C-alpha cells in the first residue's frame, strides 16, 4: 500500500516561522511555529538575524513532522511564502550573512529614499517598478548594507556576495547553495525589478550602484527551483516548487484567479490586493502596482493598498487602553454600544497609509460627548478598520474603472463578525470569509502542488477553499454615505492637525 502524500508550506513571517502540512483536500494536517528575535539597533530600525530565521525554519520543519507522524519522504513538494522586502546579503562561499537582515518595516534607509526623490527619480521608478520610492522596499536596504559593511561593495563587484529576499535565502539554504532564485512576486517588491519587461532594471541598478552579480535569477511562482539537500530536510530530497510573497500567496490561496477579484488580509495591518489580469495598470491614486503571480507562462498583475493599523488597533484596545481582556471580546462590546455611530477613531498611530501616505499624521478621536461609553469607543475603533478598507476599495474602483462585487477576506480580525458585517454595510458589497483562514500558507502549498501534479489545475483548486460565511450589506444607502462622509471629515481634520507649523 502506498503511503499518503502531502505538501508542506513554509510560512516565514515577520515575528515567527511556521511549517504547515496540507493534505489533498487542502486541509491542515499539522503545524509548528517558532518566534525569533526582533532587533532594534536604533529608533525606527528593525533587523533580524538571518541565521536565526534559518534555524527557526529547521525547527518548525521538524515540529510539523513530529506532530503529524508524517515522514519526509511523504512530502511531495514544498511551497515557501515569506515576509516581503526584508533583505539579506551573504557570503557566497561560507553562506554567512555579512550583516543582519534589514526588515521591511525598518526606516533606517529613509534618508536614501528621500535622496532618490529629491534627485527627481519618482516617476521613473514608478513606471518601471510600479512602486513609490520608499525605505519599505529592498533597493535602499541593499545599498545601505553595501555602504556600511567594510569592503562589501568591492566584494559584491567581484561576485563574492549574494543578495536575496527571505524566499531566496531559504531556498539557497535548503538546497545547500545549489539554487539562488526568487519569484516574480518577491522580485516585484525589491524596487530593482522592471515589472513590465520582467527583468532586473539596468538603469535602476546603475543609479543605486548595485552590481548585477549579486542578484538572484527570477522564476515563475510555480515550478521546481531545486531539491532539498537531504541533511537539511531530515533525509528527504524534496522539490521546492512554489514560492510567493505573503500577500500574493494569500491572493492565490483565496482563489482570486480572475481579473477584478479582490482579497483583504486583516492582520496587524491590512493588505488589499486586486488581480488586474495580464495588463499592468499604474495607479494614479497612490496604490502600488505589483505582480500577483506568474504561472503557466503568464504573468498576472495586481494593485495593492496597504493600511498600517488594522488588527493592531484591537491590540491597542487590549494592551494600551486595557478596555478588553482579549481581542474577540471587542465584538461583544461593539454590539452593546447603542450610540448613533457619531464617534470616529482615526488610528493613524504610525501615519496614514494608502491612499493618503501621510507619515506625519497621528491617531485622533472625534465626536466624544459626556454620554460616550467604553462600548462606543470600542465600536468606533472596529469601524475605523472598515472605513480604511473602503478608502482603498473606492480608490481601486476609480483606478480600474470597475465595480467590485465581492471582497474575499482572511486573517485574524476577519473572525470578528461585527467588523465583517459593518464592512459589508459600509462598502455596500458582499464579504466572503474563507473557510480556511490559513490562506497565505495554503497559497504557497497550492503553487507547489500544481507544479508537481499533486493538484491537476486551477479548477481542482477551486473546490478546495470554499467561502465559509457570506456577509451581505443591510444598511440603507443614505445612512452608509452619511457615516462615510463623517469618516472623511475626521481624516481631513487629522491631517490638518498633523501639518507642520511654520
UniProtKB/Swiss-Prot annotation:
| InterPro entries the UniProt entry points to | ATPase_NBD, Carb_kinase_FGGY, Carb_kinase_FGGY_CS, FGGY_C, FGGY_N, Glycerol_kin
GO MF terms listed in the record are: ATP binding; glycerol kinase activity
Chain sites annotated for binding ADP: 14, 18, 268, 311, 412, 416
> Which SUPFAM superfamilies does UniProt cross-reference here?
Actin-like ATPase domain (SSF53067)
Catalyzed reactions per annotation = glycerol + ATP = sn-glycerol 3-phosphate + ADP + H(+)
Per the record, residues carrying Phosphohistidine are 232
Q: Which UniProt keywords apply?
A: ATP-binding, Glycerol metabolism, Kinase, Nucleotide-binding, Phosphoprotein, Transferase
Question: What's a Pfam family in this record?
Answer: FGGY_N
Q: What is its EC number?
A: 2.7.1.30
Q: PROSITE patterns, per this entry? A: FGGY_KINASES_1 (PS00933), FGGY_KINASES_2 (PS00445)
> Which Gene Ontology cellular-component terms appear in the entry?
cytosol
Q: Where is glycerol bound in this sequence?
A: 84-85, 136, 246-247
UniProt-listed GO biological process terms: glycerol catabolic process; glycerol metabolic process; glycerol-3-phosphate metabolic process
Its pathway, per UniProt, is:
Polyol metabolism; glycerol degradation via glycerol kinase pathway; sn-glycerol 3-phosphate from glycerol: step 1/1
Q: Which residues are involved in binding sn-glycerol 3-phosphate?
A: 14, 84-85, 136, 246
For ATP, which residues are the binding ones?
A: 14-16, 268, 311, 315, 412
Q: What modulates its activity?
A: Activated by phosphorylation and inhibited by fructose 1,6-bisphosphate (FBP).
The UniProt family comment states: Belongs to the FGGY kinase family.
* Assembly information from the UniProt record: Homotetramer and homodimer (in equilibrium).
Name the HAMAP family on file: Glycerol_kin
Q: What does this protein do?
A: Key enzyme in the regulation of glycerol uptake and metabolism. Catalyzes the phosphorylation of glycerol to yield sn-glycerol 3-phosphate.
Protein name per its UniProtKB record? Glycerol kinase
Organism this protein belongs to = Streptococcus pneumoniae (strain 70585)
